[in-house]
UniProtKB/Swiss-Prot annotation:
Binding locations of ATP: 318-324, 339
Localization of this protein: Cytoplasm
Catalytic activity of the protein: L-seryl-[isocitrate dehydrogenase] + ATP = O-phospho-L-seryl-[isocitrate dehydrogenase] + ADP + H(+)
Name of this chain's protein: Isocitrate dehydrogenase kinase/phosphatase
GN (gene name): aceK
Taxonomic superkingdom: Bacteria
Pfam families: AceK_kinase, AceK_regulatory
Gene Ontology terms: biological process: glucose metabolic process; glyoxylate cycle; tricarboxylic acid cycle
EC code: 2.7.11.5, 3.1.3.-
Residues forming the catalytic site: 374
Length: 571
């Protein structure tokens, strides 16, 4: 008599693996408070990278458990996997993180089977979870009412959010925050006896900062609220700002930032809380912002297929200069670009496909300091041919036939990255006012400086490789030539040996593979003479090799820079 197919046993192994992953994820996350209190800034960076890498490491580990525990012909009988899915659903129904466990199951399925075997019967292409569930548990938020003065309300907050390191000068902080609050909100709000503040109970940590996140509200209106805290070594903890502007808070949760460390027993409830105060953010971005980037990827994919099913949108080539390494296309009604690697690169490019993939994956694990767009990597996208503009599809088939192909009336994209769509900086400057040009070039230089101080050298710093977000921030998004700043050899151009050297079309000095000459930047970056002069006035030190060498020395000495995710006026 044949043995029953072990659907329940396979489902249990997958969920046990998820529990193991979540325990390790939580352990790293819970260490964030101690690292902040002890000012262990380099440990913070290492922990962030370790937590990102943890997911794939644990998927590989559980894949090994499954292959060891079940015979191949049993485990890999895909026709039986709807039984595994049903057994798994029964296991996760009582959980508080059940939406994440669906994504985990999908990752294990994809690690075992080729993508052409993906179906909603075998895995969770569409979620089986309700959008909002009510669980019996302790509240994840604290609420503070205005009883007398604003300062008293703020004092009550900081009494609840104490650390092992004391606040350096809490009275001064309270006075400053009260003043900022009065500047941010209408006078009637500050005097409204029904004014309340609701804060998420766990503190959010990222880089050198800790963040209290919540909202201010009256019966009629609400505003987001973020209070960033800094640990000034030797001077205690300081409340650095009070931010109520939705655009400013949105930037703090931007796709250009590293992921927060925050302990959230019920992730979906916290994401819904964030969604209420940041209605312009997609839930995919909010899940990603707190470290659940794989589930963010799931939510992104669901939003994409829903958009395609419910619109007449078609893929078109993205605006801007065609890439030398990547081909980029987009959906006009969906705020994302899709990037594929070309089969052949422009002759001036010395990288290969494997190097490009390595560079793009590197971006996931480094501190993006608000200046590099996050990416999601996908394999085996399948779309109806009718969803492509014919010229777009023809170009993709021409430049990347090993990646893009037609299977009947289906377009198969074997490998691609997605990024948030932005306006290319070169196109933005073409139509910008004088004031907008000044602001954009100021921010462009700051982006380069902040990336460099975080040990990232963009390599190709042309304007076309940077974009402008809806909030007006300049962000780098083309990663095929990035490297660690400490790997670059910055040099001054040697003086000419003879007068004839300056007239020669060839350099009179040797150039190594990692050599960079900042004096060559001005004509390389700017064809427009006016923009070149303006940028030289704003950020002329970028043309000096000694400036870059100074940054390298600071990085090698272990210095971790301060890059604030809120504008100076908020501080």
């Amino acid at each position: 008599m044949s043995q029953p197919w072990p659907a329940a046993e396979i489902a249990r192994v997958i969920l046990d693996g998820f529990d193991d992953y979540r325990e390790h994820f939580r352990r790293i996350t819970l260490g964030a408070r101690e690292r902040f209190e002890q000012a262990r800034w380099q440990d913070i960076q290492r922990a962030a990278a370790a937590r990102i890498n943890l997911y794939e490491e644990k998927v590989a580990e559980v894949n090994g458990w499954l292959r060891k525990g079940f015979e191949g012909q049993v485990l890999l009988d895909v026709e039986q996997w709807p039984l595994v899915k049903n057994a798994y659903i029964r296991l996760i129904d009582p959980r508080l993180d059940d939406e994440l466990s669906e994504t985990w199951y999908n990752s294990l399925f994809c690690s075992l089977f080729s993508h052409d075997q993906i179906s909603d019967g075998c895995m969770f292409i569409h979620t089986t979870r309700p959008s909002m569930r009510v669980h019996e548990r302790a509240a994840q938020t604290r609420t503070y009412a205005l009883t007398d003065r604003l300062k008293g309300l703020l004092r009550a907050i900081f009494a609840d959010y104490a650390f092992d390191v004391p606040y350096g000068d809490l009275e001064a902080d309270l006075s400053r925050l009260e003043e900022q609050l009065r500047e941010c909100l209408p006078d009637w709000v500050c005097k409204d006896p029904q004014l309340k503040i609701e804060l998420f109970t766990p503190v959010l940590y990222r880089n050198k900062g800790a963040y209290l996140v919540g909202r201010l509200y009256t019966p009629d209106e609400q505003w987001p609220l973020v209070i960033p805290l800094l640990h000034r070594e030797g001077h205690g903890i300081e409340a650095d700002a009070l931010i109520t502007d939705e655009a400013e808070v949105s930037i703090i949760f931007s796709f250009t930032r590293s992921y927060f460390m925050v302990d959230v027993p019920v992730p979906g409830e916290f994401v819904n809380f964030l969604k209420r105060i940041l209605p312009g953010k997609h839930i995919a971005e909010l899940y990603t912002s707190i470290g659940f980037y794989k589930h963010g990827k799931s939510e992104f994919y669901r939003a994409l297929i829903n958009h395609l099913a419910n619109s007449d949108d078609r893929f078109v080539m993205a605006p801007g200069v065609r890439g030398m390494v990547m081909s980029v296309f987009t959906l006009p009604g969906f705020n994302t670009v899709f990037k594929i690697i070309k089969d052949r690169f422009s002759p001036s490019k010395t990288v290969d496909r494997a190097t490009v993939i390595e560079k793009y994956r590197l971006v996931k694990s480094v501190d993006r300091v608000g200046r590099m767009a996050d990416t999601q990597e996908f394999a085996d996208f399948r779309f109806p041919q009718g969803k492509f503009d014919p010229e777009c599809l023809a170009e993709l088939l021409e430049v990347a036939p090993s990646t893009v192909s037609l299977e009947g009336d289906t377009v198969l994209i074997r490998h691609c990255w997605t990024e948030r769509r932005m306006t290319p900086l070169n196109l933005y400057l073409e139509h910008a006012s004088e004031g907008q040009v000044l602001e954009a070039l100021e921010d462009y230089g700051l982006a380069i400086k902040q990336l460099a101080a975080a040990n990232i050298f963009p390599g190709d710093m042309l304007l076309k490789n940077f974009g402008v977000t809806r909030h007006g921030r300049v962000v780098f998004y083309d990663y095929d030539e990035i490297s660690f700043l400490t790997e670059v050899n910055f040099r001054h151009i040697p003086p000419p040996r003879y007068p004839e050297d300056e007239m020669s079309g060839e350099p009179w000095y040797s150039i190594g593979p990692h050599d960079v000459f900042p004096e060559e930047f001005p004509p390389f970056l700017f064809a427009d003479i006016g923009q070149r002069r303006l940028f030289s006035r704003l950020h002329g030190e970028l043309y000096d090799a000694d400036y870059w060498k100074g940054l390298q020395e600071a990085i090698r000495a272990g210095k971790v820079i301060d890059v604030f995710p809120y504008r100076r006026k908020s501080r």
